[in-house]
Amino acid sequence: MEASLLKKNQSIELTIEDLTHDGSGVGKIDGYPFFIPNTLPGEKVTAKIIKLNKNYGFARMENIETVSANRVEPPCAVYSKCGGCSLQHLSYDGQLEFKRNQVEETMKRIGKLNVEVPETLGMENPWRYRNKSQVPVGFVNGKLTAGFYQKRSHAIIDMSTCLIHNEQGDFAVQKTREILAKYGTEPYDEQTGKGDIRHIMTRFAHTTGQLMIVLVTTKERMPFKEEIVRDLVEQLELTSIVQNINPHKTNVIFGDRTKTLWGKDIIEDTIHGIRFAISARSFYQVNPLQTEVLYQQAIDAAELTGEETVIDAYCGIGSISLCLAKKAKHVYGVEIVDQAIQDARANAELNELANTTFETGKAEEVIPSWYKAGIVADVLVVDPPRKGCDEKLLETILAMKPKKVVYVSCNPGTLARDMKILTDGGYVAKKVQPVDMFPMTTHIEAVTVLHLN
């Protein structure tokens, strides 16, 4: 069939050749590509065209004529509707290979780099891994419910469990939902801006078993607040109940004010023997088992002897910094969020690690000022957001010339771009190691070390 004859709502037959970075299958008709969710390479499918652009189209899978050996039945009852997961229909071995291929292809296409990409480091059990849940509250069929948003919408799915949340947090969400419904709590309405409760959040500490519930409300006063807290304490094993007040008409989850309603202000967890105090709003990795794997890769790559000065750009609450401080002469950390820096200093004190300095600011501004003041890193660690490293920071790295740059990435595209700049500037990378921090989703973390040539 010629691509020029295609029309919306038409049924087409095609073979899926590849997966995109977001997990959709790609098949072509007369060289014209279609993106089709919930399909896998090698599958011959019938699909209905839902949108046609000049150079590509979108279709919805109607039937699979030839099924991939990697296809599995998704165990989640709401998988087809929910926006939380996107790869449950792909076997876990298939997911790990998909992520490895994504990294390898991105290194070649964007970075023009010929580096080794070993097998993705995955989980023995890729379920129930998330230590944090943030669940919107709303009305579904006239009753209060808490669940994830449907794909590409803000309609809430009424769900009894989430298979990637840890059991304790999952159970706590359901109990909290029941208690709120018991007292007739009114969910927040995004359209009108009315209602009392916006989100239920849970945080669970894997190593200590401590559990925090956060109620995100529209105002400080909330009907039956004391009774709700009493019931939560009676029915759940909790360390902390916190209220966050967000009065703004926005889809941002948190407001600026947080108060503890019961118990402690924080819960405590450990990574590689380092203790971390985690507040309601602290940034903390959501997969504790794989965080240990990811950080071990960074620790091994740094090859510290105790004599090195380390700079950790984008240090957050100091999670990588403090793991490295056990083996380094001194670690300097910088982070743009002031509360995270306060947390990092508190965590350094908690672990009696005096060989650390933390400063609030942009990495691309603070690190050049350190360099001018004579602070030169032997090892520089970057763990940037999805947009990658700022250009000015990369220029400073090339001027400072640390012996090693350890790069922890959550976006293979910007990792490849930044590696190209560093390798053009005299660094050499031999391999990029993918780590699966988020099974059942398309998110990819990777670690590499670049040596000064």
Swiss-Prot record:
Single Gene Ontology BP annotation: rRNA base methylation
EC identifiers of the protein: 2.1.1.-
Pfam families in alphabetical order: TRAM, tRNA_U5-meth_tr
Gene Ontology MF term list: 4 iron, 4 sulfur cluster binding; metal ion binding; rRNA (uridine-C5-)-methyltransferase activity
Residues reported to bind S-adenosyl-L-methionine: 285, 314, 335, 383
Keywords: 4Fe-4S, Iron, Iron-sulfur, Metal-binding, Methyltransferase, S-adenosyl-L-methionine, Transferase
Domain TRAM: 5-63
Keyword Coiled coil: no
Enzyme superclass (EC): transferase
Binding residues for [4Fe-4S] cluster: 76, 82, 85, 162
Active site: 410
Record-stated family: Belongs to the class I-like SAM-binding methyltransferase superfamily. RNA M5U methyltransferase family.
Family annotation (NCBIfam families): rumA (TIGR00479)
Protein name as it appears in the record: Uncharacterized RNA methyltransferase lmo1751
Organism of derivation: Listeria monocytogenes serovar 1/2a (strain ATCC BAA-679 / EGD-e)
